[in-house]
Amino acid sequence: MYSSSNSFLGGANSARPGQQPPFMQQQQQPSYSQFPPGQQQQPQPTGFAPQPTGYAQPQLSSFGSQLQPQPTGFPSGQLQPQFTGFPGAAPQQSQQPQPTGFQPQQPQFTGYPPQSQPPQLQVPAATGLPLRPAQTSSEIANSFRDASGAAPPPPPKSSGSKIPNIRLSFITAQDQAKFEQLFKSAVGDSQTMSGDKARELLLRSRLSGSDLSKIWVLSDSTKSGQLFFPEFALAMYLCNLRLTGRDLPDALPETIKNEVSSMVDIISFQVPDTQPEPVVRTNVPNFDAPLMENKLAPPAPQQPQPQQPTNSQLLNQLTAQPTGFLSQPTGLSPNQAPFGQQSNLAPQPTGLPGQPQQQSLQPQPTGFMSNPQPTGYSGPRPPVPPIPTGYASNLSPSQTGGMSGLVAQPTGIPGQWGFVNAPSSGLPNIEALKQQLMPQPGREGGFSTAGLAGNASIPWAITKEEKKIYDDLFRAWDGFRKGFIGGDTAIEIMGQSGLNRQDLERIWTLADPNNRGRLNMDEFAVAMHLIYRKLNGYPVPNRLPPELIPPSTRNLNDSIGTIKSLLSQDAESRKATGAFLQPQKTGVSYLKEHSFRGGAVSPGVGRKDATLFKNDDQAAAGYRSSARRRVGNNGRTPSPAASSQASEDELSVEQLKKKIRETQIMLDAVDFQDETRAEEDDALDRRDRREAESLMDRIRRVQDEIDTHPNAAFRNLDNGAERRSLRRQLQAYEDQVPQVASEVRRVEREIAEARLELFRLKDAKAHPNSALNIVGTGPGGTVTEADRIKARARARMQARAAELAGRPAPATQDDEGAAARRLESESANVKADREKNDAMTRDVEDSVKDFARSLEDSLKDVSENSTREHEKRRWEDALGVEDVIRDFIYDLKRNSRTAHIRKEEASRASPSQSQQSRYDEPPAVRPSPPPSTGSTGSLPGTTHEDRVAAAKERAQKRIAERLAAAGLKPHSEASETLVQRQEREKREREERLKRAEEEDALREQERQRRLAEERGTPAQPSTKPIGKKPPPAPPSRRARTDSADQSEAKKAADEAAKVEQTAREQAIREEQQVQEEETKRLEDEARQREEEFMKEKEAQEARLRALQEQVQQGKIKKQEEKRRKEEAERRAKEQEAKLAAQRAELEAAKERERQLQRELEAMEEESSSDDEGPEFATPRNGSPAQTEAPTAEAPPPPPPAPATAPPVPAIAEPEAPTSPATSPASSRANLSPEAESKNPWFKKIGQPADSQPAPVPQAATTPSDTHSTNPFHRLAQQQESTAPAFTGSAPLERKTRARPEDDDDWSAAGSEFDSSDDEDDRAGGGSAKQLASILFGTMAPPRPLSAMDDKSPSKTPTPVQETPAPAPEADAAPSAPVAAPPPPPPPPVPAAAPNGSAGAPPPPPPPPAPPMAPPPPPAGVPPPPAPPAAPAGAADRGALLASIQAGKGLRKVQTNDRSTSSTAGRVLD
């Protein structure tokens, strides 16, 4: 079972059949090099060189001659090792081959051949041949023992396959008997069944391949590829399980596994070991050992091919080799013929070839059968250093050393460390490697492998110098003398060598064969030696060579193998002799035949070792519990303590003294161990104390950094009280979300119903005779069949009444189906919008819920439990800790509290300063926010409100993202800081409040006007307050655009603030929990801040609700105004249709109407001259803008320059000379659209002085003290100057019949916002509409001035245009004084700038004003307004006639073609 044959190369038992000799792949081996044909390997100096041990042993010569190994086959049991006197020397140079019994061989000379004899090369027998049936190595060893008279133990007799008589519990007795018979018939004399045979038997069961594979895996418990009988029985049992339909288990039960393994062990110990114990280990490698047990064998060389080298090759192959003592003649005695073979072996002279034996040493016969004798010089043995020799080209030997000083030395058994000397040249770079790997300060900074690598010749074995260096390294790194180096330390050491990771992994695997994760001193030396070899170019071996196996490992493995062999052979012999029946009664020790050191003929046979030890139970002394109870014969046997007492009393004085000395030595050793342990403990304590102090210093530094960080106050969020408060607040907000969502849905439903109702009203106005003009009386305002019947009856009555009155019957424009289709289409649109809004509401609700969950998760500390919280509080309170740690914790708390108080004081000072600076800023000017990229150190974001605001901003960000996903893209804006955001929000609140007040006043005025209009009672023009501000114009597209821009800007600002909040939120998560003693105070502060925040939030929500109501009312007002416009248009169309039908009958009435028109214009001119007198109370050549400019800005002499709008600076120059003044109607027309703008920036900038409502108007309003180039600001100034111009009464003035100023076809920039609704609303269409307006305007009573002023020119349905310029001004224009006035400002361009789009074309200049009364200009082109100079109350006929003569009245009868766009330009003549 354990092969330990020491056969040579080519022997009969040198290799097992089919087994690859180990280390076949190794190329560099110390003494068994492989020589391919025609190539000689360069010899290497070896550390542990094999030595000849007394019989012929072919070794490769160190001189490089191609000497082939000789197969001998002789056992190593009887010959003693020969000492050559020089450790590490080359093998014996000249020995005669010994007869081996295999084949006769010619003698060979080792070393350099003599001069007279050419080198002879033998062709040895091939190694690795299969075993010969004639003789085995064991039989040859036994034959040697027989010849020497020794009595070896009887060899085990082959008794066939023996199966122990053990009953297996998992099968029946009958099945076990059948399985035994089948197993014996299949294996014969073997104890195991091969895998192939087992496969044939198992395939007969006809099971599937997967089942058989699983059965084999479960059965082959030894994983050897063979089955013992219990394994075979288990396989049969598992096959039976599968054949009966049951499933195979994944793992065997413990009982079955134990039974099978126990029986396998019993069978294995019955197998005898046929190999004898080696008496003496030699340097001959054992090539027959298994892979894991051959600890001594180098790789088996391959058999080289015979080749006859030439002399030149021999000369080239000779290199310097260390030589020492001359070899001694060995061999068998010539007069003995062993084993029946005639072999006359004479002693063979050795030594240096070609030199006479002039030394004092004579060859000594060593006889094979004689006693072992030492050879060579037998005098004293002083150590001799290695002496290098070398043969130059002339083959002259160099120094060989003196013969007198050479003595026999140990031979260097493989693995016998410390007895191999280094080469004479020393080991290069070894000191550099030592210095590199030694622990030293600063080694972490890097290392260099320069100087470590080389190409030195390094032997396999570790030399004494190397071992000393490696031991020093080990002790330097093993500071606590633990006896080993851990993996981390070894990685640090080995990593400094510079080798790559793969090589270091392989080296570690070889050095740590037991996989313990650490290295002792010997294993560390092995690893360092392999690293040293690798640095010098040698590859890392795949298997550890025998020279490098540590002695501890090798001896332990050999001892285990020997004990197993002894046990098995002893058990077998005792079974054969029957001695096992009474093992304690025989009195014979069979252990005398065995020894760890060798057989009975070994020199140490008289010495006892562990194999002869026998335990003596009576020798044990001490207390015996049975000594106190001796009850006659029934009791237990008396204790043998008396005999031990007697044995101690019989000790002599010397023995007692010896015991005392031993005890003293043990006590000293114990004291030394205690001192060493105490020193180690002190060192550990000092190290722990240093580490603790270093850690406390680091904690202090980190705490100081936390306390001084700008965001240090945010760590209060980790406080449990504040976290709970935030949770409650978050829960309150979550509870409000469903209510807000339901409110939004209710508002959406109301909006949808209002839209449907509005559509019904509009459709009824657009189609007055349609079936849709039916008031539904059903549920929800639905139209029932009864309503339709009533509507048809009403239509028939109207038709009959028209027929009776002589009027044509009202034509039905569409049928009921068309009205239903329109309603259905509008309902579908409304429903789609409502569903879209509902989806947006759901998305916003989901995003709010997701954000609330994320906030709740962030506020909820999942990892915290009651136990951890309790332990944390105990640690913070310094409970259960040492005094040093308690003082340290209290010191940290004091420092943190001081820093917190200091931070709070700084934060209180910072907001007050920022607040003061905010108050000092002008409220009307908003500086552009600079991009915020700085730190947050100056931010007052250390309060509860700031954190809540940040959370609100994050929620708004999510909502904005959902809105953006729905198609509403927020406007991108540069990010702003928290201070800027707070300032902006404050200004917005002030502006919203101001706008709310203004809109309240405007809404009240609109309500009063609407009530008066619905009652139909015209207000007296004389009661109009002087300077009353006109009501707001209907909403425009620009107002809606400004509102959208405002919301987008706010969303972008919120989104920009969220980016900044992200970093703060991350810092909040990492904050520390505050001290326990501050909890109560912080809770009170948090509660107060929460109450303040709730109050502020409620106020803000109230303001927001008020603003929302105002916005809603504004929308309703817009819808009502639009409805009124559509109703007026419908009435105009209706009248137009009637007039078109009766145009033939009214032909005669046209002349009368023209006369009425002239009279009406004359009356209108008279009233307008009376009312507008104070408005034009300016110098003759001045204008309102010119009079305002000096008051607003006195220093610049030309006032038009600052009054010109920035968007159109190029238009002011050509228009200044040709436009003397701006009419008040144009001013009012240009100002009225802006009255309803919701843009906060426009409201803030454009209303510095007149934005406040004026319930008690004054005659004149002082303009703002500050002049602005903003067009909106200038419009407000013009409004101030033109509004109080109406004094007196003008009963016949019809502002609604004035032709709008912006209806001139060449001005696109002066039109009102290019609104399609406004285009349709203009009543200046065809002549029929003009006539109808004139006709019904003269019939109706005069309208109140409030209604007249409210209407912008875009809403006037009549074509009559008002020209307030009197004739005297037109006549006085050419006769102006010599001092010409400054050029007037441009006409309504500044008013058009904010209304029109940015890309609107500039208006062309009007025609030049003639010096005298101009003729009527082309149709649609307004005349240049004359400068107002008429005094107040000047209403004489001369002025009116002069204005009529100027052509004013003639323009009013021009037909305005509505087939073209009202905003299109015309080419002037």
Swiss-Prot record:
Residues 175-263, 466-555 form the EH domain. Residues 54-83, 323-346, 391-401, 634-646, 1264-1284, 1456-1469 have a biased composition (Polar residues). It is a peripheral membrane protein. Residues 1-163, 276-311, 323-409, 619-650, 801-845, 898-1469 are annotated as: Disordered. Residues 1162-1174 have a biased composition (Acidic residues). Residues 298-307, 1193-1209, 1379-1391, 1400-1430 have a biased composition (Pro residues). It is found in: Cell membrane; Endosome membrane; Cytoplasm, Cytoskeleton, Actin patch. Residues 818-845, 943-961, 981-1016, 1039-1106, 1117-1137, 1144-1161 have a biased composition (Basic and acidic residues). The keyword Repeat applies. It holds the Pfam family DUF1720. Residues 1436-1453 form the WH2 domain. GO terms for molecular function: actin binding; calcium ion binding. InterPro entries: DUF1720, EF-hand-dom_pair, EF_hand_dom, EH_dom, WH2_dom. Component of the PAN1 actin cytoskeleton-regulatory complex. Component of the PAN1 actin cytoskeleton-regulatory complex required for the internalization of endosomes during actin-coupled endocytosis. The complex links the site of endocytosis to the cell membrane-associated actin cytoskeleton. Mediates uptake of external molecules and vacuolar degradation of plasma membrane proteins. Plays a role in the proper organization of the cell membrane-associated actin cytoskeleton and promotes its destabilization. This is Actin cytoskeleton-regulatory complex protein pan1. The gene is pan1.
